[in-house]
Amino acid sequence: MKEKYILSIDEGTTSTRAIIFDHNGNEIVSAQKEITQYFPEPGWVEHDANEIWMAVQTTIANAFIQSGIWPGQIAAIGITNQRETAVVWDKDTGKPIYHAIVWQSRQTTDLAEKLKKDGYSNLIREKTGLIVDPYFSATKIRWILDHVPGAQEKAEQGKLLFGTIDSWLVWKLTDGQKHVTDYTNASRTMLFNIHTLKWDKEILNLLNIPEKMLPEVRSNSEVYGTTASYMFFGGEVSIAGMAGDQQAALFGQLALKPGMVKNTYGTGAFIVMNTGDKPTTSNNNLLTTIGYGINGKITYALEGSIFVAGSAIQWLRDSMKLIKNAPDSEKAAYESTSENEVYVVPAFTGLGAPYWDAEARGAIFGVTRGTTDKDMIKATLQSLAYQTRDVVDTMQKDSGIDIPALRVDGGASNNNYLMQFQADILGKKIERTKVLETTSMGAAFLAGLAVGYWKNIDELKHVFTIGQAFEPKMGDLERKKLYDGWQRAIKATRVFAHGE
């Protein structure tokens, strides 16, 4: 009998990947395709949902071809995805009626501000765990219904469907047979009540979004359906695990005990803390969200979302032309001779947690005649670590838990300079996993558990391993001095955006 594997579809903000894992958690093959970014107006970010679907098909086919594995050897498919990004499509034709509005996009700022001014912030916070912000799906759906002629009427007639990217992909993979999402993705829409685990009728009425547009909400580990018979060279494969990218990473890191924290350095950086079976309300602008729901039990989490992380390194490469590829940033940072007096605040699309300032824009401080390109690169890398500390400090305040270590993953966690500086500025141990793609691994774990590929979570503990740890080396006085400088830079950035 041929060996069985798990296929993870990892649909991210800048690219789509298909990764095949074996029973020991080894990555057998990874196929990747970049996604076109559309910027119709300043601050707007959109994707073509059809292009995303084509990229998923291409990467899956390439993974099979490169590995020699055939669909009959796939025990299950797990899906993980960029969250909040909103797709609205025609139920009959299966065609999107507008581009997918991406989580980073600020085109619905006016709608979010109106909700705040009308006094709905507390209601929405209490029900969804989220703050009112253009980041989440709700205002994106409202924007599409407002700006596409006839869309509201069609939605009310049940002719339009909404989904986050997971929902869109399951719809396409099952040839329109299943319109479902999972607890984690639903909890990021600003429409889902995280206490009742249902779409919230009061918020839907407030935004005039018909509930019939919305997908059925399911757990993170169960069989949702099978792929259509004409796909994957004729093999029908169970789709059995789904989670938004950051919750998938939390599960992939096996951060399954209250107080465990992970940071994924992707396009943005996302720090998530397991808070157990009761939601923890933040007094400092962190998000209360669903970590995962399996076997009839919900685990909640606190999250701090940083909008710009890996995309700051892309900015160095693509816009500033200071590096040719991302790994060059590590070498440049080590070669910089500056005393860390330069600060880059990469608020290209506003500031995320704990500030939630949609109007802030990027700024650079402390530049002298002697500042070099390497100093700028180093300061940009350091900005990821400073922003992470902003969130970790806030999590400790909200939870009352002293976080002993931070588990890290994602592309930028491969940068040794950044990881050491992260340990130094936090004064905490950094644990980098052996498999950096824990987002895909988490989706694989969820799918594998659903079909018995792995018997239970104890079996997963033998699969997961820490690759390298970074201990803090910086003294307390130096740490305080550098972080004080960062806080001044943040304050000045916000003053510039808003005036005194």
UniProtKB/Swiss-Prot annotation:
It is an enzyme of class 2 (transferase). Keywords: ATP-binding, Glycerol metabolism, Kinase, Nucleotide-binding, Transferase. It catalyses: glycerol + ATP = sn-glycerol 3-phosphate + ADP + H(+). Glycerol binds at R83, E84, Y135, D245, Q246. It comes from the Bacteria. Activated by phosphorylation and inhibited by fructose 1,6-bisphosphate (FBP). One of its GO terms (cellular component) is cytosol. Sn-glycerol 3-phosphate binds at T13, R83, E84, Y135, D245. ADP binds at T13, R17, T267, G310, G411, N415. Pathway: Polyol metabolism; glycerol degradation via glycerol kinase pathway; sn-glycerol 3-phosphate from glycerol: step 1/1. GO terms for biological process: glycerol catabolic process; glycerol metabolic process; glycerol-3-phosphate metabolic process. Gene3D superfamilies: 3.30.420.40. GO terms for molecular function: ATP binding; glycerol kinase activity. ATP binds at T13, T14, S15, T267, G310, Q314, G411. Pfam families: FGGY_C, FGGY_N. Its EC number is 2.7.1.30. SUPFAM superfamilies: Actin-like ATPase domain. Key enzyme in the regulation of glycerol uptake and metabolism. Catalyzes the phosphorylation of glycerol to yield sn-glycerol 3-phosphate. Belongs to the FGGY kinase family. Homotetramer and homodimer (in equilibrium). This is Glycerol kinase.
